[in-house]
């Protein structure tokens, strides 16, 4: 493919995901993996696992077959790494690895492995817990019960591994009281819609129905015992969530069989820095095969691009970028007008 010529631990990632939905659904750290170094694990093993996670992210599938397809084609994992560093955070060692986007895309193309762009779904988790003893409550990003802390940590891990956004609401006491009040006329789902932007809401209610029994209803149906409730609930919850993520990502696959040319007009470029930033942004669009600059006039860049995938995939990548504002497309859907957001 021809283009323009030329950290964080899980808790920190959790803060980023929860505190800034203004970035839309563009997963701009897609090619950077942070991996916890387990006790007794050497650097090479950690790098290999980081590579595997990178392939899972980019393909949208957690099946190891894509990893082995790449390795069996004569590629070494280390060839895809541009740099890595090791950091100690609160007594825990992490390896931060950055991967070569261009080489990965070319390899996926050569081996016909499905690829997912940076446009990633946002999941809102609304989980109500009623243990029959205390007042019912909604698990939020700040709630601190044992189950809540386990959920927060594992949600962050899953979001990082799959390259998606998984959000718990930020409810204060008034929010919870409003939602749980029988006199509150707005359904909880409507209340969330008024406060958050997301692609899919997963609403679950967990109720203790007996001394040794819990009922899980809504987006997940299950009957669980009390003895190992936290473990069993987390198991069925994350199995369900992982399936939902796989289904959503599968719908975002960029097809190599569809190869299209489009004209781009990018306005509001007022400096050399703006121009360089635009180049980097276009360079980062997954599925872009070639870019030809035609002219620059009146603070507007005119170029031709070749893109693997349908127009809808390209428009999603543009529309969900923090620095690009999609203005319109022509009637024939061959001309795309964009504005650079300062």
Language-model regions: role of each:
Residues 27-36, 191-239, 336-342:
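Amphipathic beta-strand/beta-sheet edge segments enriched in Tyr/Trp
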Residues 67-129, 136-137:
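Signal peptide-directed extracytoplasmic domains
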Residues 133-135, 238-261, 267-268:
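Acidic, glycine-rich low-complexity/disordered segments
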């Amino acid at each position: 493919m021809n283009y323009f010529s030329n950290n964080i631990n899980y808790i920190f990632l959790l803060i980023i995901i929860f505190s800034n939905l203004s970035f839309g659904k563009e997963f701009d750290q897609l090619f950077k993996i942070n991996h916890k170094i387990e006790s007794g694990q050497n650097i090479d093993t950690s790098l290999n696992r980081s590579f595997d996670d990178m392939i899972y992210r980019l393909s949208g599938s957690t099946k190891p077959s894509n990893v082995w397809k790449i390795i069996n084609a004569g590629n070494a994992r280390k060839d895809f790494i541009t740099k890595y560093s090791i950091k100690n955070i609160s007594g825990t060692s992490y390896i931060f690895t950055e991967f070569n986007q261009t080489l990965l895309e070319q390899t996926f193309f050569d081996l016909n492995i499905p690829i997912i762009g940076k446009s990633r779904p946002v999941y809102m988790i609304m989980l109500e817990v009623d243990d029959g003893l205390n007042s019912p409550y909604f698990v939020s990003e700040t709630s601190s019960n044992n189950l809540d802390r386990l959920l927060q940590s594992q949600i962050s891990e899953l979001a990082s591994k799959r390259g998606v956004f998984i959000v718990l609401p930020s409810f204060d006491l008034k929010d919870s009281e409003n939602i749980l009040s029988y006199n509150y006329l707005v359904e909880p789902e409507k209340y969330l819609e008024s406060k958050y932007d997301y692609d899919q809401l997963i609403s679950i209610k967990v109720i203790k129905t007996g001394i040794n029994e819990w009922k899980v209803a809504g987006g997940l149906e299950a009957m669980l015992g009390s003895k190992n409730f936290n473990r069993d609930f987390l198991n069925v919850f994350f199995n369900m969530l992982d399936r939902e993520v796989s289904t959503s990502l599968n719908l975002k696959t960029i097809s190599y069989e569809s190869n299209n040319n489009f004209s781009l007009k990018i306005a509001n470029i007022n400096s050399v820095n703006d121009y360089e930033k635009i180049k980097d942004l276009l360079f980062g669009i997954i599925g872009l095969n070639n870019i030809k600059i035609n002219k620059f006039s009146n603070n507007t860049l005119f170029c031709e691009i070749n893109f693997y995938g349908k127009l809808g995939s390209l428009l999603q990548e543009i529309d969900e970028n923090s620095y690009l504002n999609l203005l319109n497309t022509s009637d024939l859907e061959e001309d795309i007008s964009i504005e650079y957001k300062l």
